[in-house]
């Protein structure tokens, strides 16, 4: 199983995976909006034959009154590949990319109040916390939990890894690191391109799933 950054030619298969797994679906232009605006943030899981079996579609929010933060638009894993930890791996990879590319401080998502499997995954495994309830968020009138995950712990871990990597190269006498080519810990989290605009879709940031498997969240 391989987790990698999504490419433009993956978007149709990501949409197909979404249609198979979830009741909340999106037009292809919305996938392109994410892929072109934040190409670093969306990831796919592919099997040994290169077929997409899961994905995470993510973006950065653009609120001038808040700290930099990302948002998970959709997360899904096909039923045939659930309970392998793919949802957690996809989520962690997207969160890491938010930190490294845009200096994100937290990541948010929405989930149906009735989706107990998703709530369990987000709360108990991924350390999300409910921030508020949004009444009638979904098209069928169901309320949504707005949830947030603080990324400070992951940021600290990435900094530690960077320091260890730098020290290892210094011990080995690498000419590249002796010349100071590695960034310092803070530089790894500086924003690079946070300038894209929202497409205006109001009901496209839900994260929910119709099954009881933990790895099928979207």
Swiss-Prot record:
One of its GO terms (molecular function) is protein N-terminal-serine acetyltransferase activity. Gene3D superfamilies: 3.40.630.30. Keywords: Acyltransferase, Cytoplasm, Nucleus, Transferase. Residues 1-152 form the N-acetyltransferase domain. It is found in: Cytoplasm; Nucleus. Displays alpha (N-terminal) acetyltransferase activity. Proposed alternative catalytic subunit of the N-terminal acetyltransferase A (NatA) complex. Component of the N-terminal acetyltransferase A (NatA) complex composed of NAA11 and NAA15. Interacts with HIF1A. This is N-alpha-acetyltransferase 11. It comes from Mus musculus. The gene is Naa11.
